[in-house]
């Protein structure tokens, strides 16, 4: 049975991709990061998300893969992405289809605010 967890920037499926289709799997999790391209990603930042995903999956090792556990992993990854944005590791993609600033308004340094919001 296909389980999924969908947040704004993370989609997790208990499935593998075959011929561009999701095929349910009891052994494979498929991760889709930022499907709407809301952020600008460097390879390092994307790898941080993948490592965090691996760490979270490992933390559930030996437990049943339930809808609840999958949603917790997705939620934890969503919070991790927020932390990357706050640290400046990623930024909003101003060429995105929709600019909704779902993780908060961008912070732009000015001489008056320099260093105050770190």
Swiss-Prot record:
GO CC annotations on file: plasma membrane-derived thylakoid membrane
The keyword Membrane is annotated on this UniProt entry: yes
Topology in membrane: Peripheral membrane protein
EC numbers for this chain: 7.1.1.-
Keywords on record: Membrane, NAD, NADP, Plastoquinone, Quinone, Thylakoid, Translocase, Transport
GO molecular-function term, one example from the UniProt record: quinone binding
Subcellular location: Cellular thylakoid membrane
UniProt keyword NAD present: yes
Enzyme class name: translocase
Protein origin, superkingdom: Bacteria
Catalyzed reaction equations: a plastoquinone + NADH + (n+1) H(+)(in) = a plastoquinol + NAD(+) + n H(+)(out); a plastoquinone + NADPH + (n+1) H(+)(in) = a plastoquinol + NADP(+) + n H(+)(out)
Oligomer and partners: NDH-1 can be composed of about 15 different subunits; different subcomplexes with different compositions have been identified which probably have different functions.
Protein family according to the UniProt entry: Belongs to the complex I NdhM subunit family.
Function summary: NDH-1 shuttles electrons from an unknown electron donor, via FMN and iron-sulfur (Fe-S) centers, to quinones in the respiratory and/or the photosynthetic chain. The immediate electron acceptor for the enzyme in this species is believed to be plastoquinone. Couples the redox reaction to proton translocation, and thus conserves the redox energy in a proton gradient. Cyanobacterial NDH-1 also plays a role in inorganic carbon-concentration.
Protein name per Swiss-Prot or TrEMBL: NAD(P)H-quinone oxidoreductase subunit M
Lineage, opening ranks: Bacteria, Bacillati, Cyanobacteriota, Cyanophyceae, Oscillatoriophycideae
Gene designation: ndhM
């Amino acid at each position: 049975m296909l389980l999924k967890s969908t947040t704004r920037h993370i989609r997790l499926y208990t499935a593998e991709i075959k011929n561009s289709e999701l095929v349910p799997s009891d052994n494979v999790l498929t991760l889709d990061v930022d499907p709407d391209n809301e952020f600008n990603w460097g390879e390092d930042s994307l790898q941080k998300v993948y490592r965090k995903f691996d760490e979270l999956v490992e933390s559930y090792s030996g437990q049943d893969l339930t809808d609840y556990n999958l949603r917790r992993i997705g939620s934890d990854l969503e919070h991790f992405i927020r932390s990357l944005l706050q640290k400046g590791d990623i930024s909003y993609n101003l060429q995105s289809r929709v600019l909704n600033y779902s993780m908060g308004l961008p912070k732009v340094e000015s001489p008056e605010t320099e260093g105050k919001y770190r």
